[in-house]
A protein has these predicted regions:
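Soluble "head" domains of membrane/secretory-pathway proteins
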Residues: 1-117
Length: 117
């Protein structure tokens, strides 16, 4: 996995409790890899002391604050591209490698944005 990859993974058990969603699989973008340092300051997210690209940050505090944390070996930190409405690692934490089904390689919706990722 690489930063920016869009992945499909088995929904963590906390999703139903925290987000009220019972879908079996989720699709999110990888923003931090094992060994990366992640933190939130105000309403911005930093990975290895670098502010994430604007489209990956949120405009108001969502989820839980992230103290400076190193992503554990074998885990990934993911965010949804529709960040203001996404239940993602900000709410339920890291995604273990064992839960990842694969990488998304094509977008087919909306039709105006169809193409390879």
């Amino acid at each position: 996995m690489n930063i920016g990859d869009v992945i499909v993974f088995t929904s963590p058990g906390a999703v139903a409790t925290v987000c009220g969603d019972t879908v079996p699989d989720l699709v999110k973008r990888v923003v931090a890899l094992p060994g990366d340092t992640i933190a939130s300051i105000g309403n911005r997210i930093y990975v290895n002391d670098q502010l994430l690209k604007e489209e990956w940050t949120h405009n108001e505090p969502l989820g839980r604050p992230i103290p400076t944390t190193v992503v554990p070996k074998g885990d990934y930190y993911v965010l949804g591209d529709n960040h203001p409405n996404s239940c993602d690692s900000r709410y339920w934490g890291f995604v273990p490698r064992s839960a990842i089904i694969g990488k998304v390689f094509v977008r087919y919706w909306p039709l105006s944005r169809i193409g390879w990722l």
